[in-house]
A protein has these predicted regions:
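Mobile "lid/hinge" segments at catalytic clefts and subdomain interfaces of large enzymes
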Residues: 28-29, 93, 176-310, 406-407, ...
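Accessory "access/gating" subregions that flank catalytic or transport cores
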Residues: 134-138, 143, 148-152, 156-183, ...
C-alpha cells in the first residue's frame, strides 16, 4: 500500500473519567443519545399498543429501531425478516479492512451513522506489551495507515493500536442502554452489559448500515434467563455464561436474543453483565442483554458519562422489560432458564468446545477420566471477555495472596488488559505489580492469544498439553495452532489460581498448595471492587478523531501489495454454472469459521482476498479421509483423484471453469463473524454450501456474497454424497422464498440420486444472488453500477 501523505489535522482526544484537570472528558455522540431517548417512549408505547401486550426489553429495543421501510406489526419470531436502523457501527482492524474496501465502492462521502475502527487484532503476543506493540506498528504499518486514512476520509473514529480491544472500548465510550448497534466481530454482544442490543455481523452488513440502507435480520426469538440469589466466594459472572453454555450448547441460542432478568441480574456489575453477553456468541445467540439498573448507572458515571446516565434515568421504565414479562416469563419468552447464583459453582469449560461445562467439583475427575494432560502449562487472563477493572482486581487479590503465602506461578501466566484506560488505572492501583510479582507477564491491550496472535513459548509446538484462559473460545488450534492443545475456559480468578498451582486438577475451593517453605497453604476466595475507588485515569486513550472534511484525503492501494487488494465485484451465479459441479470439501464434524478461514498468522492478509484465500478450509476435516487440507481433485483426470490442499484444489477447478460446492454438518460456520469465510470460497469458485444447519452470522455472510446457502431437507442425505460425484443443483431460475431446490448426484458408476434442499432466502436476499452479491445490489441502488 502507498498512501499519499495526509495533510488533514487529526484532533486527538484524551478520554478518561476523573481528574479533569489532567484529562479532557467527552461524551461521544451525545446528540444521537438524546434523540434516541426523546423518541423512545412514544415508539415503545405505540409498539405495545399494536402488539396488544406487555413487551420484553428485547422487543422494546427492536421495535424502537425498526427502519421506516418496516411497518410496526406483530412480527413472527424466528419467521419474519425485518428491516432495522441500528444507531452505530463498530469494526475491528481485521474485519474493517474488507468492510471498508467494500464501503469505498459505494460512492458516499461519509458514513450514515457514527462508526469506529479499533486496532486490536493485529498485535502478536510474544515478549510483552511494549515490545509487541512496537513490532506490530512496524509490521502492520501499511494496514494501520490504510485504516487511519479511510477513517479520516469518511468520518470514522479511529482507535489506534494499543488503545484496547474493540468491545471494552465500546463499553467504556459508546454503549448506552436501549440502543442498537452492529459490529464486525462476533463478540459485539458484549455491549449488552450496558443494556444494548448489539449484534455481531459480517462486513457487508456493516456496509448496509454505513451507507444508510436498511439492515435486515430475521425477527429473533427471545430466551429468558431468570437469575436469583447472589454470587459469592469463587463464583463470578463468567460462571453464569459457562453454565448457560452447558445448558443451551453451541447452537441452542441460534436465532434468539437472550434476555437476563431477575434479582440476581441486578446484583451483577455492569462489566460482569458484559462478560455474560459477550460469551452469548458461544451459544449461537443473536445477542444478549440486560435491563438498565443501578450498576449500569454507576458504570456510566464512572466512565465520564453522567449526562448519559441522567438521560437514561428519565426513561428507565422503557429500558427494561415490562413487569408482566418478568412476573410470568413463560407467557412472553420462547424458552425460560432459571439459575440460582447463590448455589452456582465455578465452572471450567472445554476442551475444544465452549459448551462442555464442568462444575469445578467434577473437573478433576474429568481430567483423569479423559486423560487430559494434568500439568497446566499456561494460564492466560484478560481478553474482551474478562479484562475489566473488577476482573483484574479480583484476580490480583489471588495473586497478592500467593505472594503473601510464598507462592509463585508454576505455569506461564499472562495478563491482557482490555483497554489503555484499564491498563493505566490498574497500573496506578497496583494490580499489574501483583501479577508481575508472582511471575506474570503483561501483554498489550489487544486480542493476542485469544485469537491465535500468540508466539507461544514452547519446546514442542505439537505436543499434547493443557492451557486455561479467561477468554471465550477454545476451538482446536485456535490459540496456538496446535491441535493437541487442550484449551479450557474459566474466570480470571480461577485461571490465576490454577496457574499458581500448575495442575489442572487443583480445586481452590478445597485443595491446599505447598509453598516455597514447604508449608501447606490455602487460597482464600477472591475479593475485588467493580470500579476503581480513585476513578479511572489515562494519559492517552488512543482515540483519533476524523477530519471535519475528509474530501481532500486520497487513498491509494499499491497493486503489488500483499496486504491490501481492491475488490472486483462478484458476478452472479448462473444456472449452467450449477451443472457438473465438483466437491471442494465435504467437511466432517465441527466446521467453524476458524476451520474455514484461520486467524493467527493469516490475519495479515485480511485485506487481500486473493492471498487470504490460500487458507480456505485448511483446518476442516475431509469426511473421506479424516485428514485436514487433503482433498481429491479431478481436473487432471476425471476418473482418478489427485490429492492436494483445499485452496490449490479450488484454484485448479476455477482455472478449469468447473464450479465447486461445499458440504458440511451441524452448526456450520460457528464462531467468528469474519465474512472472509464466505468471500474466500466465493473467490475460489464455490457456488453453493449445503449443510445440515448453519450458524446465523455465517449463513447471512454467505447470502451477502451471492452464494447459495442450502440445508438438507433430510440430514441423512449427507451420507449419500460420494467423493467423485458430479453434482447439479436445480431450481436457481425459479428460486423463491420457501421453495425447495434439488441436488442431483451423478455417481461414477453411472447411477444418480436426487434429494431436496431448503433455504431461508427472502426476496431481497434472492435479489442479492441475482446481482452477484449484496454489495452489488447496494451499488445498483445507489447508482454506482
Amino acid at each position: 500500500l502507498k498512501v499519499i501523505e495526509i495533510k488533514a489535522v487529526y484532533k486527538v482526544v484524551f478520554f478518561c473519567t476523573f481528574a479533569p484537570s489532567k484529562q479532557h472528558i467527552m461524551v461521544f455522540d451525545l446528540d444521537l443519545i438524546q434523540r434516541v431517548y426523546q423518541e423512545l417512549p412514544a415508539k415503545i408505547e405505540y409498539a405495545r399498543k399494536v402488539l396488544g401486550r406487555p413487551l420484553t426489553l428485547t422487543e422494546k429495543i427492536l421495535y424502537s429501531h425498526l427502519h421506516p421501510e418496516s411497518e410496526i406489526k406483530n412480527y413472527q419470531r424466528g419467521g419474519d425478516y425485518v428491516f432495522f436502523a441500528p444507531d452505530r457501527v463498530a469494526m475491528q482492524d481485521a474485519t474493517a479492512q474488507m468492510a471498508l474496501l467494500q464501503f469505498m465502492m459505494c460512492g458516499r462521502d461519509k458514513t450514515a451513522v457514527p462508526s469506529t475502527v479499533h486496532c486490536d487484532h493485529l498485535i502478536l503476543a510474544e515478549d510483552g506489551a511494549q515490545a509487541d506493540l512496537q513490532r506490530s506498528l512496524e509490521v502492520n504499518s501499511e494496514v494501520f495507515n490504510f485504516l487511519s486514512s479511510v477513517s479520516n476520509k469518511y468520518g470514522i473514529g479511529f482507535w489506534k493500536p494499543g488503545a484496547g480491544i474493540i468491545h471494552q472500548i465500546v463499553l467504556e465510550n459508546y454503549a448506552f442502554p436501549g440502543a442498537m448497534m452492529i459490529g464486525t466481530d462476533s463478540h459485539t454482544p458484549n455491549a449488552g452489559g450496558l443494556g444494548m442490543v448489539a449484534i455481531g455481523v459480517g462486513g457487508a452488513d456493516a456496509v448496509d448500515v454505513m451507507t444508510g440502507m436498511p439492515w435486515e435480520l430475521k425477527m429473533p426469538k427471545v430466551i429468558g434467563v431468570k437469575l436469583t440469589g447472589k454470587l459469592g466466594g469463587w463464583t463470578s459472572s463468567k460462571d453464569v455464561i459457562l453454565k448457560v453454555a452447558g445448558i443451551l450448547t453451541v447452537k441452542g441460542g441460534t436465532g434468539a436474543i437472550v434476555e437476563y432478568f431477575g434479582p440476581g441480574a441486578a446484583s451483577l456489575s455492569c462489566t460482569g453483565k458484559g462478560t455474560i453477553c459477550n460469551m452469548g456468541a458461544e451459544i449461537g445467540a443473536t445477542t444478549s442483554t440486560f435491563g438498565y439498573d443501578e450498576a449500569m448507572s454507576r458504570y456510566l458515571r464512572a466512565t465520564g458519562r453522567a449526562e448519559v446516565a441522567q438521560l437514561a434515568d428519565q426513561v428507565r421504565d422503557h429500558l427494561t422489560g415490562d413487569p408482566e414479562c418478568y412476573a410470568n416469563p413463560a407467557d412472553y419468552f420462547d424458552q425460560v432458564i432459571e439459575i440460582d447464583l447463590s448455589t452456582l459453582e465455578p465452572h471450567i469449560n472445554g476442551p475444544y468446545t465452549p459448551d462442555l461445562a464442568w462444575p469445578i467439583s467434577e473437573f478433576a475427575a474429568a481430567v483423569k477420566e479423559h486423560n487430559y494432560p494434568q500439568k497446566l502449562e499456561v494460564g492466560l487472563i484478560g481478553s474482551c471477555t474478562n479484562s475489566s477493572y473488577e476482573d483484574l482486581d479480583r484476580a490480583a487479590s489471588v495473586a497478592r495472596q500467593a505472594k503473601a503465602k510464598n507462592l509463585k506461578v508454576k505455569s506461564e501466566f499472562t495478563v491482557t488488559p482490555g483497554s489503555e484506560l484499564i491498563r493505566f488505572t490498574v497500573n496506578r492501583d497496583g494490580q499489574l505489580d501483583a501479577f508481575e510479582e508472582i511471575g506474570g507477564v503483561v501483554l498489550a491491550n489487544a486480542c493476542g492469544p485469544c485469537i491465535g496472535q500468540w508466539a507461544r513459548h514452547t519446546d514442542d509446538p505439537d505436543r499434547a498439553n493443557s492451557i486455561i484462559t479467561s477468554f471465550n473460545r477454545n476451538f482446536s488450534k485456535r490459540n496456538d495452532g496446535n491441535p493437541q492443545t487442550r484449551s479450557f475456559v474459566a474466570s480470571p480468578e480461577i485461571v490465576t489460581a490454577m496457574a499458581i498451582a500448575g495442575d489442572l486438577t487443583f480445586n481452590p475451593l478445597k485443595d491446599t498448595l505447598t509453598n516455597e517453605k514447604g508449608e501447606q497453604v490455602r487460597l482464600d476466595p477472591p475479593v475485588g471492587v467493580e470500579l476503581p475507588p480513585r476513578g479511572f485515569e489515562v494519559e492517552d486513550a488512543g482515540f483519533q478523531a476524523p477530519a471535519a472534511d475528509g474530501s481532500s484525503v486520497q487513498i491509494k492501494v499499491d497493486a503489488e501489495s500483499n496486504r491490501l487488494q481492491l475488490l472486483n465485484p462478484f458476478t452472479p451465479i448462473t444456472d449452467n454454472q450449477l451443472q457438473g459441479m465438483r466437491i471442494l470439501i465435504k467437511a466432517k464434524g465441527k466446521c467453524t469459521t476458524d476451520h474455514i478461514s484461520m486467524a493467527g498468522p493469516w490475519l495479515q492478509f485480511r485485506g487481500h482476498l486473493d492471498n487470504i484465500a490460500n487458507n480456505s478450509f485448511i483446518g476442516a476435516i475431509n469426511a473421506y479421509n479424516d485428514q485436514a487440507n487433503h482433498v481429491a481433485n479431478y481436473v487432471k483426470d476425471a476418473s482418478q483423484a489427485t490429492f492436494m490442499a483445499v485452496p490449490d484444489s479450488g484454484r485448479a477447478y476455477k482455472a478449469a471453469g468447473i464450479s465447486t460446492l461445499v458440504f458440511g454438518e451441524e452448526n456450520y460456520g460457528e464462531g467468528s463473524s469474519r465474512e472472509h469465510a464466505a468471500m474466500q470460497p466465493r473467490h475460489l469458485g464455490v457456488k453453493a454450501v449445503v449443510v445440515k444447519s448453519f450458524a446465523r452470522i455465517h449463513e447471512t455472510n454467505l447470502k451477502k456474497q451471492g452464494l447459495l446457502a442450502l440445508t438438507f431437507a433430510n440430514p441423512g442425505d449427507y451420507d449419500k454424497i460420494r467423493q467423485d460425484d458430479k453434482i447439479d443443483i436445480l431450481g436457481l431460475d425459479t428460486m423463491a422464498p420457501g421453495k425447495q431446490m434439488f441436488v442431483v448426484l451423478h455417481h461414477s458408476d453411472g447411477s444418480s440420486e436426487q434429494f431436496a434442499v431448503n433455504h431461508t432466502y427472502n426476496q431481497a436476499q434472492i435479489d442479492w444472488v441475482k446481482a452477484g452479491s449484496a454489495l452489488n445490489k447496494i451499488r445498483q441502488d445507489l447508482g454506482q453500477m
